[in-house]
């Protein structure tokens, strides 16, 4: 690995946009792999370093390149609500069908975490609301099972339903979303699912 490439990896993770630019100008490998197989763009995304990510994306970094645990800049930004970076990845060819190590699209962890603006962005971009991950769950299942039933999760469920999520898809154990919500006492979510 060249010095410029080492500098690029460090600068991206630190969010030092000027150092990123210098390293790229010095011929650094924009797709080099650092710790954990992270590209400079994945490293910048994981640290939510917007300016560094912007420079890398504009210089042609692959928004779909995955690290050793199957995170890409697109998937990670979606999963963590790094919406500015997410929008950039979507504008630069993010693969909406790409999946993480759990076989889920970016919409599933965004829903699990109650990240309403991120859920809206992903649905608007065309991510399939009914994709089923390796656990047998859709975004709707995750919002119910791993959420806390609070108002933000009610909004996520409403947004998923308005975005076309199918409330009749059963989880891997054959349980409907409405039954999952009822079992947890999430009355407001039950009401959304029954509307």
Show which residues each predicted segment covers.
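Intrinsically disordered, low-complexity regulatory segments in ankyrin-centric signaling systems
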Residues: 1-26, 35-38, 58, 195
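Ankyrin repeat A-helix N-terminal signature
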Residues: 10-15, 43-49, 76-82, 109-115, ...
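Ankyrin repeat structural motif
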Residues: 16-24, 49-57, 82-90, 115-123, ...
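Leucine-rich solenoid repeat scaffolds
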Residues: 167-195
């Amino acid at each position: 690995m060249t010095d410029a490439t080492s500098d690029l990896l460090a600068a991206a993770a630190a969010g030092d946009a000027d150092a990123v630019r210098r390293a790229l100008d010095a011929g650094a490998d924009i797709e080099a792999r650092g710790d954990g197989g992270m590209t400079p763009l994945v490293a910048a995304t994981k640290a939510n370093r917007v300016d560094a990510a912007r420079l890398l994306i504009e210089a042609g970094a692959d928004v779909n390149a995955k690290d050793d645990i199957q995170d890409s800049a697109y998937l990670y930004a979606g999963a963590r609500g790094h919406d500015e970076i997410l929008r950039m990845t979507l504008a630069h060819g993010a693969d909406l069908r790409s999946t993480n190590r759990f076989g889920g699209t970016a919409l599933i962890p965004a829903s699990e975490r109650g990240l309403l603006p991120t859920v809206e962005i992903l649905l608007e971009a065309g991510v399939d609301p009914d994709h089923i991950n390796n656990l047998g769950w859709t975004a709707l299942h995750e919002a119910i099972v791993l959420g806390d039933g609070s108002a933000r999760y009610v909004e996520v469920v409403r947004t998923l339903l308005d975005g076309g999520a199918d409330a009749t898809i059963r989880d891997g154990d054959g349980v409907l979303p409405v039954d999952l919500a009822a079992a947890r006492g999430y009355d407001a979510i039950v009401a959304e699912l029954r509307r």
